[in-house]
């Protein structure tokens, strides 16, 4: 029996990703002025309309509308035909302060910070790719990233901002994985030459990415399977912050606790603890303790320390699980304040996470491999 696994990604122009970017752009602007601010910002997008809401407690002065329009403009939504226009769309703001009840548990003092909510978070790493991420999600990200880049550079004729990718990897021979199928759905102008459009996608995007990963190019190809993708963006589908949590993480290859990332400051463990769990899992795998590691962590609202931590190696461990648990406990502190300090999560760097995955990019602090030497000892 063949072993096939599939993951998907979306471009920065996807309606849900528009919302993630606006929420994280607002978070960054708040943190620039007030690093200790409490932020939970949500965005809703539909045809030429945005609603920005949430709870934000800060001393910062923020122009929410300007930030939202700037994000839309940078993506390329500057035309009414695209579903939303940065210059003409209506924007409503419904932002309030954080609940005083929640603040009781979080604002303990500067050194002891309670978790912003209860919940479970997962972190995962595998040695099947250079980024320590599963191949399917990694390739999916690269496809839409390249397509968007070519569009912005004016090299991708007829393409519009809304794009999706889906990659199926054949793991029948686990030592030699292959691409089975690549699907791309790319919004396009009303008038275009379909054959030329599809030929460009196969040769200049799909094949280029496959070769980058030193994988086969004789895969099954699906491009805009309905035959037409003119109506897209928030006109084609309503967008919401936090609705692409599997795209943001491991493409379904690892479990997910259900909490979204974007628009949340680091006291929200949905985000910060998931980053820390990824950081720990990646360093443990890079140290050679296992081929695959998944870490689950849980918290109670207002409590600074996790309620539980669980490690799964899927039978790929190279040392005993006791040794792996010891390495985790000795090298990684999952208290909320220590996560924030270790990963430097008071800085305004979150907008970069809102597209093409929160993991696998070397510039992020939770992707550094600074614990490997210590663990190997």
Curated annotation (Swiss-Prot):
Mg(2+) binds at residue 16. Its cofactor is Mg(2+); K(+). It is found in: Cytoplasm. GO terms for biological process: one-carbon metabolic process; S-adenosylmethionine biosynthetic process. It catalyses: L-methionine + ATP + H2O = S-adenosyl-L-methionine + phosphate + diphosphate. GO terms for molecular function: ATP binding; magnesium ion binding; methionine adenosyltransferase activity. It comes from the Bacteria. Gene3D superfamilies: 3.30.300.10. Keywords: ATP-binding, Cytoplasm, Magnesium, Metal-binding, Nucleotide-binding, One-carbon metabolism, Potassium, Transferase. Its EC number is 2.5.1.6. Binds 2 divalent ions per subunit. It is an enzyme of class 2 (transferase). Belongs to the AdoMet synthase family. Homotetramer; dimer of dimers. This is S-adenosylmethionine synthase. It comes from Mesoplasma florum (strain ATCC 33453 / NBRC 100688 / NCTC 11704 / L1) (Acholeplasma florum).
């Amino acid at each position: 029996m063949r072993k096939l696994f599939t993951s998907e990604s979306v471009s920065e122009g996807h309606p849900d990703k528009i919302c993630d970017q606006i929420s994280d752009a607002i978070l960054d602007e708040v943190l620039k002025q007030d690093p200790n601010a409490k932020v939970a910002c949500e965005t809703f997008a539909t045809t030429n309309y945005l609603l920005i809401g949430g709870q934000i407690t800060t001393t910062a002065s923020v122009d929410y509308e300007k930030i939202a329009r700037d994000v839309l403009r940078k993506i390329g939504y500057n035309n009414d035909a695209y579903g939303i226009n940065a210059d003409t769309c209506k924007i409503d703001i419904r932002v309030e302060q954080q609940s005083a009840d929640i603040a009781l548990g979080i604002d303990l003092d500067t050194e002891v910070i309670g978790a912003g909510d209860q919940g479970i978070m997962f972190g995962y790493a595998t040695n099947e790719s250079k980024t320590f991420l599963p191949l399917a999600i990694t390739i999916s990200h690269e496809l839409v990233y390249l397509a968007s880049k070519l569009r912005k550079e004016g090299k991708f004729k007829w393409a519009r901002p809304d794009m999706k990718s889906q990659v199926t990897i054949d793991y029948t021979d686990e030592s030699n994985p292959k691409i089975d199928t690549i699907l791309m759905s790319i919004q396009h102008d009303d008038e275009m030459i379909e054959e030329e459009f599809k030929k460009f996608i196969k040769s200049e995007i799909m094949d280029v990415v496959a070769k980058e990963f030193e994988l086969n190019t004789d895969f099954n190809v699906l491009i805009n399977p309905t035959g037409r993708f003119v109506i897209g963006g928030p006109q084609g589908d309503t967008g919401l912050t936090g609705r692409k949590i599997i795209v943001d993480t491991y493409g379904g290859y690892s479990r997910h606790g259900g909490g979204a990332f974007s628009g949340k400051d680091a006291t929200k463990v949905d985000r910060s603890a998931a980053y820390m769990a990824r950081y720990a899992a990646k360093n443990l795998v890079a140290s050679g303790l296992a081929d695959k590691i998944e870490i689950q962590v849980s918290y109670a609202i207002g409590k600074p320390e996790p309620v539980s931590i669980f490690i799964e190696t899927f039978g790929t461990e190279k040392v005993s699980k006791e040794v792996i648990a010891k390495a985790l406990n000795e090298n990684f502190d999952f208290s909320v304040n220590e996560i924030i300090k270790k990963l430097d999560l008071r800085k305004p760097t979150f907008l970069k996470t809102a597209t093409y995955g929160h993991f696998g990019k070397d510039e992020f602090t939770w992707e550094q491999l600074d614990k490997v030497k210590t663990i190997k000892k």
